[in-house]
């Protein structure tokens, strides 16, 4: 999957608006983190993802959360652990967005780094450790 463009992914945000993943933050790399409110390791890494997202400038990596969860569960979770980056929703299953982004094992959390042209640069199965995200994402911040 690295170097390839994933199939188009269009999902609702928390307000029910359909959003094309590739259209978020044009010209910026995307770090797409797939998670769920019931996933312990996902919950543990959310503050680190928020810190990373907040440290990005106008041209930095755009973080996008992709929750394989029910909207109300996600809203309740985000009241406890707020984030400033966009959150999209999908239902878990054999053709969910995580699978379409290359998560063949179906485990969470799962993160994909897309370059400015929305090609897959890197994939990570499992949680980030503190301080790991910036180095991992650095592959997407250079010139294309």
Name each model feature, range by range.
Residues 8-30, 98:
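A short beta-strand-turn-helix
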Residues 33-38, 68:
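Aromatic-flanked redox-active Cys/Sec active sites in thiol-based oxidoreductases
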Residues 31-32, 63:
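Hydrophobic beta-strand anchors of alpha/beta hydrolase catalytic cores
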Residues 37-44, 110:
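C-type cytochrome heme c attachment motif
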Residues 9, 34-35, 77, 85:
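Conserved hydrophobic/aromatic "anchor" residues
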Residues 1-12, 122, 138, 142-144:
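N-terminal targeting signals for export/organelle localization
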Residues 43-82, 92-98:
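Structural microenvironment flanking redox-active thiols in thiol-disulfide oxidoreductases
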Residues 79-84, 90-138:
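Thiol/disulfide oxidoreductase modules built on the thioredoxin-like
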């Amino acid at each position: 999957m690295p170097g390839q463009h994933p199939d188009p992914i269009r999902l609702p945000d928390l307000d029910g608006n359909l959003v094309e993943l590739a259209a978020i933050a044009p010209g910026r790399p995307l770090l797409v983190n797939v998670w769920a409110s019931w996933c312990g390791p996902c919950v543990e890494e959310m503050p680190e993802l928020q810190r990373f997202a907040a440290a990005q400038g106008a041209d930095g990596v755009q973080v996008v959360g992709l929750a394989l969860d029910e909207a109300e569960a996600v809203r309740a979770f985000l009241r406890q652990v707020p984030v400033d980056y966009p959150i999209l929703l999908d239902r878990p299953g054999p053709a969910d967005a995580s699978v379409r982004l290359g998560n063949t094992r179906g485990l969470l959390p799962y993160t994909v780094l897309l370059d400015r042209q929305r090609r897959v640069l890197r994939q990570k199965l499992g949680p980030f450790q503190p301080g790991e995200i910036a180095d991992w994402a650095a592959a997407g911040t250079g010139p294309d």
